[in-house]
Amino acid sequence: MATEWYLMEPDVLGGFENTEFRNWRGAFKNSILTTDFARTVDIYGNYPTNKPKRIRALVLDQVENSYNKMKERQILTELGQIQCGDLLLIDGRWWLVISLVDQNRLYSKGILYYCNSVLNFTSLKTFNTVSYPVVVHNATQYNSGERATDYMVTLSSQRLYYFPANDETILFDNDYRFLHDRNKLHPSAWKIAQVDTENDDWDGYGIVRVMAVEDELLMTDDVENMVADNSKWIEKHGKNSGYQSVEDIPPSDGGGWIDMT
């Protein structure tokens, strides 16, 4: 009936869809993100040392019965607030946006992996020691790129690391070493076997994946600070061989494009 027009669903094909979408976005922000269902999220962008930007967001799948899924979350934010490769601090825990951040005209959606460790290493940009929250997976079942004979004789395991892509992490290369272990007295050393900077490149943002294989602990490794000795690696490649002048990656402090078409 004509008198019940106000009960009708919004018409997104009637020429007033922009107004309707703005109203729905307002409802998402003002009604949902202000409730107890929303969480406070600090966005650090693609550097853990950035000044964080605080937002409210929905974090989904917080109660999972599957081991493979318990370190994964989905996040819904206002449009343009997160990008792939952003580091997020939620309830005192670090998370990494590992997916292309898609968005309809109401909200942005991304997939998060839990950063289950912190890695110290010598930056190939500044040659200072830096610390990154990282996602680490046991990757023994995957191909590391090492020759099978070498792997069988000298290596016992391998790991897959996820880093936010920035002008520091894209400089990783084969044979660069890490110390990474909860055993601080006799830690395990790891050597890079493969680096993937392209597979998760979204509009210049994204993820750097590093496959590392177990290596020997050196007497010159800084066990106290958990920093591997890469002096010979740096000497071999040289400080002036391109490791200080790389193609710029957009410095992300969180956020990205907003398609309003």
For each feature predicted by the language model, list its residue ranges.
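Active-site-proximal polar cores
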Residues: 1-48, 115-131
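Short, solvent-exposed secondary-structure boundary/capping segments
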Residues: 68-72, 101-116, 194-216
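Short coil-to-beta transition motif at edge beta-strands of beta-rich domains
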Residues: 39, 78-90, 166-184
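Short, basic/aromatic beta-hairpin or loop at an interaction surface
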Residues: 51-73, 141-161
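Oligomerization/assembly interface segments of phage tail-like spikes and tubes
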Residues: 68-78, 151-165, 192, 206-217
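Surface-exposed beta-loop interaction hotspot
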Residues: 93-165
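Long terminal accessory segments
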Residues: 3-7, 14, 191-261
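Short beta-strand-centered aromatic/proline hotspots
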Residues: 55-57, 87, 93-103, 177, ...
